[in-house]
Curated annotation (Swiss-Prot):
Gene name as annotated: rplM
Entry keywords, A to Z: Ribonucleoprotein, Ribosomal protein
Oligomer and partners: Part of the 50S ribosomal subunit.
Pfam families: Ribosomal_L13 (PF00572)
GO biological process assignments: negative regulation of translation; translation
Family assignment from sequence similarity: Belongs to the universal ribosomal protein uL13 family.
Any one Gene Ontology cellular component term annotated for this protein: cytosolic large ribosomal subunit
Protein name per Swiss-Prot or TrEMBL: Large ribosomal subunit protein uL13
């Protein structure tokens, strides 16, 4: 008997909704990364994208513990000389809450071509509504 290896066409994908309201950013991100990667499935295969689609709602209501709102920084570069842009997470959550959650999840996924495919299955929304009702997503509870 040999080890089971999932094939890309055998994978059945589900849709899950995670409500981030009042939840810690790291807890939401780890659960989302786990679902995107497919680690919760018995058919998990490291070199095949076995993950599911994840919808995160209420990204603006996610919380950070301690002093991270003021101390933690979001750094990006425009590509031009002197184009380094730095903002703290309080500003980032106020202006682009989706980016804060996406960056946290993206950091927990493999940094290769398979990881880039996995991140495309992540949908993050600022409020509590999303346009994916037709996919009949299941609610994924996070214990805080």
């Amino acid at each position: 008997m040999s080890t089971f290896m999932a094939k890309p066409h055998e994978v059945e994908r589900k849709w899950y909704v995670i409500d981030a309201a009042g939840k810690t950013l790291g807890r939401v991100a780890t659960e989302a990364a786990r679902l995107l990667r497919g680690k919760h499935k018995p058919i998990f295969t490291p070199h095949v994208d076995t993950g599911d689609y994840v919808i995160i709602i209420n990204a603006a209501k996610v919380r950070l513990t301690g002093n991270k709102l003021q101390k933690k920084q979001y750094i990006r570069h425009t590509g031009y000389p002197g184009g380094l842009r730095v903002m703290n997470y309080a500003t980032l959550l106020r202006t682009f809450p989706e980016r804060a959650v996406e960056k946290a999840v993206k950091g927990m996924i493999p940094h290769n071509s398979l990881g880039r495919k996995m991140v495309k299955k992540l949908k993050v929304y600022r409020g509590d509504s999303h346009p994916h009702a037709a996919q009949q997503p299941q609610v994924w509870e996070i214990k805080d």
